[in-house]
Amino acid sequence: MNLHQYAETHQVTNQPPSLDGVNLYRIDLPLQYWSQHFGAGWAQGRIDEYGALAGGPLMAAGFLANENKPQFVSHDRYGHRIDLVEFHPSYHELMRTAIEHGLPSLPWTDPQPGAHVARASMTYLHSQAEAGSGCPLTMTFASVPALRLQPDLAAIWLPKVLATEYDPRNIDISQKAGVTLGMAMTEKQGGTDVRANTTRAYPVGAKGPGQAYELLGHKWFCSAPMSDGFLTLAQTDKGLSCFLLPRHRPDGSRNEFYIQRLKNKLGNSSNASSEVEFRGALAWMIGEEGRGVPTIIEMVAMTRFDCMVGSSALMRQALTQASHHCAHRLVGGRVLAEQPLMQNVLADLALESEAALVLSLRMGRALDNPDDLHEARFSRLVTAVGKYWICKRAPAMINEAAECMGGAGYVEDSILPRLYREAPVNSTWEGSGNVQCLDVLRALSKEPGVLDALFAELGDGHGDRRLAQHIAQLKNAFTDTDDIQYRARQLTEDIALGLQAKLLLEAGNSDVSDAFIGSRLQGSARVYGTLPRGLNVAAIVARSTPQMA
């Protein structure tokens, strides 16, 4: 018997075409619409350009950067302490591309209307390709408001922070055109409670803003430890203060900044997170002594905003993969995406994704208008609301998207496992869920006008009885202050859903807004795929499914 004729056992059929090389912007109708709606129409060309990069070379680099994790090298071969973290070349490609396209700098260097929205849109695309590199990009972007509080230091650092040049060399910033910045706040004993920090700062000479100090202590989490400098917190005689700590001293020698080890994390694998010690590390005070938290808080707010954008991006990429798979997969002789139950699931996932995007880009518009009192109050509240709600929704949503793909969504050849492992970090980083909800209560009770700004934003329901009823119930919830901390999560969720519904209803696709309001403001669904009857789910699925050229 001649078995050679049977060497080819089967033909590969019923598999979706590859998405490799697709322009992530051009297949994303919601992003195209909302980025223009919120003021970034002038930037569509550069967003489109980044969409091609994100779906092509950056997507490929993302797989390599996560397969080849950063490695800590404490000493060189001669025994000298060097404290290096070595990255795969793909990581540097991700960083270089993002910095050259202005992801950490655009709103600061070109502060025209819509700049924050444009930058958030490109960050949204970048994070779909690879999210871990977003950490140093975000911290560099977010450091600018804090640096500006100390003009003498800003004069040295800001031109390099805002430069569109990436230089990963471990050398003093005087020899670099571009730098990145990190942040190190939490300690073993306190975590989020940074006022419990024990790291001490001792003046080298004169005391106060802009002066040099030596820091003695540790930080339990320091992400991107190969950054050129770090904003950090330490205690002085007047309390917790903010400092800029460079990797190198002015004479070019190593600063007393020692990496202890890299964290072995659930996800976020391309990004190095570390434990560090300061053993007399030279640093310069930023802002008023004893006012470290207020000084660094705007940086924290910006990083929380990027958590919203990042989680929205993870959900969008999961939806892209699931909807594309189901659009090209036959089950029982019928296209999976055209079968009623799968349409219910995919439409529900699409609602979650677009609602996350619209709230994130609405926040971007608020950041574009910092001198507008309403926008400033909106930003103060919704940074915490959105960070809580969007980041909280991502893990379950991505899990459901993977399930739509069956085993194909569970194997590491797919991007879904990486998205799923990545999703929890944004809920935890810069304050976990309870921290955000307590911040919502703080903003509403301590800062004048924030509650009024919320209800001014929500309006009267925009002609929709269901939204009007939700707003009325929300108002009643705030008149009852009993056990308000106990109810903080429910209140924050209700604010988020009300804002998402309002934004979708006010300017969005009517099929999407009707389905969102009908499923989120009414009913009590616990899992995806339980949308009520009577909705145009086919149109919602079509809106979210990549259209291949």
Task: Briefly describe each language-model feature range.
Residues 447, 453, 457-549:
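C-terminal amphipathic alpha-helical interaction region
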Residues 354-387, 402-403, 475-488, 492:
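C-terminal helix-coil-helix/basic helical segment that borders enzyme active sites and/or dimer interfaces
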Residues 80-172, 223-224, 422, 429, ...:
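Internal helix-loop-helix
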